[in-house]
Regions:
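Nucleotidyltransferase catalytic core that binds NTPs
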Residues: 1-186
Length: 186
């Protein structure tokens, strides 16, 4: 949510739409909770802040593989006068040349890159320049908060507190549904 908030502020966006994937393509996750749980956690994380953030189930409803280009085209059809930004972390943006129909992705939206430790701006720029139109990407600062989704899942699995590290409603949802707890089988 910090990344979404920073993009909203620094890029002067009117709204940020969170679109959870039905099957996350770029980051396989052990004990993946499923699309419906991820969708609900996004809704809980943005509750009370609907003026800035919207959660959409576009990719979850779609049959078959869900590609970013399809989502962007669907958004363009439903919001033809909107300028779209695709918000990505630097690590993901560096892999954009390998995406399905990457050239169409960058023709549909301005790529907005959250700078993160571990992936240099130069590496991302080189990657974006490999995709015709990608050189129009924009960067925004991401504060180093020392919290990652991997770290949060590890803390949940180890029964360590995640209080103050994520929205209370999301933490309570994870606890209630016993998500990310690991398998009881050995």
């Amino acid at each position: 949510m910090v990344c979404a908030q920073e993009a909203y502020i620094q890029l002067g966006l009117s709204r940020v739409m969170l679109v959870p994937a039905r099957i996350p393509p770029h980051k396989p996750v052990d004990e993946e909770p499923g699309a419906s749980h991820r969708l609900e956690m996004c809704r809980l994380a943005t509750r009370g802040d609907e003026e800035r953030f919207e959660v959409a189930d576009l990719e979850i409803r779609r049959e078959g593989p869900s590609y970013t280009v399809d989502t962007l085209e669907e958004l363009h059809s439903s919001k033809p006068d909107s300028e779209l930004f695709l918000i990505l972390g630097a690590d993901i943006a560096a892999g954009l040349p390998d995406w399905h129909q990457a050239e169409r992705v960058v023709s549909q939206a301005t790529v907005a890159v959250a700078e993160r430790p571990g992936t240099s701006r130069e590496a991302v720029m080189r990657a974006l320049e490999q995709v015709p139109g990608g050189e129009t990407g924009r960067f925004f600062d991401m504060p180093e908060i020392g919290i990652s989704s991997t770290m949060l899942r590890q803390r949940v699995r180890a029964s360590l507190s995640t209080r103050y590290l994520m929205p209370d409603a999301v933490r309570e949802y994870i606890d209630h549904h016993q998500l990310y707890r690991g398998s009881s089988e050995t």
